[in-house]
A protein has these predicted regions:
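Short, intrinsically disordered low-complexity segments
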Residues: 31-63, 133-155
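Surface-exposed beta-loop interaction hotspot
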Residues: 72-120
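Short, conserved charged micro-motifs
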Residues: 12-18, 60-68, 111, 153-157
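Long amphipathic alpha-helical segments with strong coiled-coil/leucine-zipper propensity
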Residues: 46-91
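Short secondary-structure junctions
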Residues: 26-35, 76-78, 125-131
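Short amphipathic alpha-helices in soluble, non-transmembrane regions
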Residues: 19-23, 64-75, 117-124, 157
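Short, extreme N-terminal segment that most often corresponds to the first beta-strand
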Residues: 1-24, 96-105
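Intrinsically disordered, low-complexity segments enriched in Gly and acidic/Ser/Thr residues
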Residues: 112, 116-139
Length: 157
């Protein structure tokens, strides 16, 4: 049974691969299937719009689809993601997202010379301790965007 997991996540390919690898390991260990592919879909600006992961389950049963849904919710993927197969679709996901856009060109040179984005990440993750963390980022011409996902958007902001 072939399924498409449409992730409501702005993951760079390398970060999507991390999720694919974790899923593959669990699917292999349980004998329930395998990850067969994936992709990252971008907006015209180059910023990631969403991601997809292709999954093949060994047995085409409602029980296995529910098992996969529960697994994805336990692992933690963004809300409004979906599992799609044969014209069917179910919503999956438990995490809420927050994007932080850092201006990369309009501030004074001093700001860029003295400020480290890694410090910003560290401080934001520290403030979100136990609620959320950074999953990915994107560097555009004008902005660097940090993508955080966690249990509550309200508490993360």
């Amino acid at each position: 049974m072939e399924l498409l997991l449409k992730l409501n996540a702005k993951f760079q390919p390398v970060h999507r691969f991390e999720l694919e690898d974790a899923l593959q390991e669990i699917l292999e260990q349980t004998g329930k299937g395998e990850v067969t592919g994936g992709g990252t879909i971008q907006n015209p600006s180059g910023e990631v719009a969403y991601c997809e992961i292709e999954i093949s389950l060994t047995d085409a049963t409602e029980e296995n689809v529910n098992w996969l849904k529960n697994l994805l919710n336990k692992i933690g993927i963004p809300k409004k993601s979906s599992l799609n197969w044969n014209g069917n679709s179910i919503e999956v996901g438990t995490l809420e997202g927050l994007a932080y856009y850092s201006n990369g060109q309009d501030l004074s040179e001093e700001v860029y010379a003295t400020c480290d984005i890694n410090y910003v990440i560290q401080q934001m993750e520290s403030a979100m301790d136990g609620i959320g963390r950074m999953y990915s980022y994107w560097e555009g011409q004008k902005y660097t965007v940090l993508y955080f996902y966690g249990t509550s958007f309200i508490e993360m902001k």
